[in-house]
């Protein structure tokens, strides 16, 4: 189970507070697919709590999902203190049409404000 919230019809937030597995990734992708049906383009806020592990194969699978749905993302705000995840997200900024910003947990309010604009 993931924690989720919405700022508006086109803005969805996800908080990940436990290690990511295939089931959780599938749940996130299902949520995003349902949001795509409601709004042609969405802003996505993802907060990854400290200590959460995300296996590399699942990061790649998620990148493939986002690339397949590239035109459906307007902004991605990623909040994490994990350097490895931050670097992967910086790479996404180069390959996706969406604006991708990475924030530290201390700047999570700034991330929420940015994604809601």
Predicted features along the sequence, with ranges:
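Amphipathic, Lys/Arg-enriched alpha-helical "gate/interface" segment within cytosolic domains
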Residues: 1-117
